[in-house]
C-alpha cells in the first residue's frame, strides 16, 4: 500500500461512516438512552416486568450500536490525523505502521456496518434452524450432517447455545432431518443469511469408484417468536401425528409416542419435535416452530421476495452457496459474490466473515 491507496481508503471509509451516521442518527440514540435512564429511575418502571425486559433489550442493542459508531468514528479520525501529520513530516515509519493497520481499520468499520444491519425487529431474537437433505440418499444425508456440524461449531465460536429439537439419523450415514434452536444475541440476525440451498461438489467417500458427486441440502431459518405475537392457526388446516422418538434421545427412545409432527396444509410446512420425554412439551415446541415458520413466510411476502418461503425442489438453480471440494477447493456465495479457499476452516464453523459479506451485499441491493 502507498500514500495514494491509503488516502483513497480513508475517503471510502469516511463516506461509509457518514452514510451510516445519517441512517442511525447517533444524536437520536443518545436522546433515547437518556429517556430510558429516566424511565428506569421511575419507581413504577419495574412493576411491569415484561415491558421492562423489552426496554432493557432495546437499551442493550442501541448502546452497542452507539459504541460501535463511536469506535469507528474515532479510529477513522485518529488514522486520518496521523496520516496527515506523518505526510507533512515525511515520517515513513509511521506511514508504514498506518498501512499495516489498514485491514484492522476496515474491520472496525465493518463491525459498525454489521451492528447497523442487525438492528432489525427480529435480528436480536433466537433462531430456529432446520436442515433437510435433498434427493440423493446417503450422499445428501452426509452433506446435511456436515452442515449441521458447521453450524454447531459456528455457534460454539460465537458463544451461542444450541438446543436440538428434532434429529433423525440417516440409514447408512448422516441425517435425514434436524431442527435446532440457537440462543444468543443476534442469533437470527446472523443465521438468516443461511436461508436457502447449499450445494456440495466432492469425490464421494461412499462411491467405490471415487466419482465426483453433487449434493444439495436446504437450510431454513426463522426467528423464535415471543409469546405475545399472535399467529392464528386453524384446526382444519393442520394434522398432528404422534410417533416414537428415534435417534439419540435417551432411555425413552422407542418406548412411548412422545414425538410430534405437525403438517400445515395451506403452506405444506411440516415441523416435528422429539426433544423432550413429554409429548405435551414436544407438541408445544412443534407449534412454536410452526408459528415461527409461518411468521417468516409472511415476512418474505411483505418484502415481495421472489422466494415465497416454500423451498422448491432441491436442485440446480436455487442454491445460495456452493462448496467445492474437488477438483479444486472453494466456497462461493452467490449473493455476495465472494469466494473463499479456506474450505476446511469454513466447514469447521469459521463462517462469520462470509455471513457478514452476505448481509452487507443484501443491504446494498
Curated annotation (Swiss-Prot):
GO terms for cellular component: cytoplasm. The keyword Protein biosynthesis applies. Belongs to the prokaryotic/mitochondrial release factor family. The keyword Protein biosynthesis applies. It comes from Campylobacter jejuni subsp. jejuni serotype O:2 (strain ATCC 700819 / NCTC 11168). GO terms for molecular function: translation release factor activity, codon specific. InterPro entries: PCRF, Pep_chain_release_fac_I, Pep_chain_release_fac_I_sf, PrfB. Keywords: Cytoplasm, Methylation, Protein biosynthesis. The modification N5-methylglutamine is found at residue 251. Peptide chain release factor 2 directs the termination of translation in response to the peptide chain termination codons UGA and UAA. This is Peptide chain release factor 2. Methylated by PrmC. Methylation increases the termination efficiency of RF2. It is found in: Cytoplasm. NCBIfam families: prfB. Its main location: cytoplasm.
Amino acid at each position: 500500500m502507498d500514500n495514494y491507496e491509503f488516502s483513497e481508503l480513508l475517503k471510502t471509509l469516511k463516506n461509509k461512516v457518514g452514510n451510516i451516521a445519517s441512517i442511525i442518527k447517533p444524536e437520536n440514540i443518545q436522546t433515547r438512552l437518556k429517556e430510558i435512564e429516566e424511565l428506569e429511575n421511575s419507581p413504577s418502571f419495574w412493576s411491569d416486568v415484561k415491558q421492562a425486559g423489552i426496554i432493557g433489550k432495546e437499551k442493550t442493542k442501541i448502546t452497542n450500536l452507539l459504541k460501535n459508531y463511536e469506535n469507528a468514528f474515532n479510529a477513522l479520525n485518529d488514522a486520518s490525523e496521523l496520516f496527515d501529520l506523518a505526510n507533512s513530516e515525511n515520517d515513513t515509519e509511521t506511514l508504514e505502521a498506518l498501512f499495516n493497520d489498514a485491514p484492522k481499520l476496515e474491520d472496525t468499520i465493518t463491525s459498525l456496518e454489521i451492528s447497523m444491519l442487525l438492528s432489525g425487529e427480529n435480528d436480536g431474537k433466537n433462531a430456529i434452524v432446520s436442515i433437510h437433505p435433498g434427493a440423493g440418499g446417503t450422499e445428501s444425508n452426509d452433506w446435511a450432517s456436515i452442515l449441521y456440524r458447521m453450524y454447531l461449531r459456528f455457534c460454539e465460536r460465537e458463544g451461542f447455545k444450541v438446543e436440538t429439537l428434532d434429529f433423525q439419523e440417516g440409514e447408512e450415514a448422516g441425517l435425514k432431518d434436524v431442527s435446532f434452536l440457537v440462543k444468543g444475541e443476534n442469533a437470527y440476525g446472523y443465521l438468516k443469511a443461511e436461508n436457502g440451498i447449499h450445494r456440495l461438489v466432492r469425490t464421494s467417500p461412499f462411491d467405490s469408484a471415487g466419482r465426483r458427486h453433487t449434493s444439495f441440502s436446504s437450510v431454513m431459518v426463522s426467528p423464535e417468536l415471543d409469546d405475545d405475537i399472535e399467529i392464528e392457526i386453524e384446526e382444519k388446516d393442520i394434522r398432528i401425528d404422534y410417533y416414537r422418538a428415534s435417534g439419540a434421545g435417551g432411555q425413552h427412545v422407542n418406548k412411548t409416542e412422545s414425538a410430534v409432527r405437525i403438517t400445515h396444509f395451506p403452506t405444506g410446512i411440516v415441523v416435528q419435535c422429539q426433544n423432550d420425554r413429554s409429548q405435551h412439551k414436544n407438541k408445544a415446541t412443534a407449534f412454536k416452530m410452526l408459528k415461527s415458520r409461518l411468521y417468516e413466510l409472511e415476512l418474505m411476502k411483505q418484502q415481495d421476495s421472489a422466494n415465497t418461503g416454500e423451498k422448491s425442489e432441491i436442485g440446480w438453480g436455487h442454491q445460495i452457496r456452493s462448496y467445492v471440494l474437488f477438483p479444486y477447493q472453494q466456497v462461493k456465495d452467490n449473493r455476495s459474490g465472494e469466494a473463499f479457499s479456506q474450505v476446511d476452516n469454513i466447514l469447521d464453523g469459521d463462517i462469520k466473515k462470509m455471513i457478514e459479506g452476505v448481509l452487507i451485499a443484501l443491504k446494498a441491493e
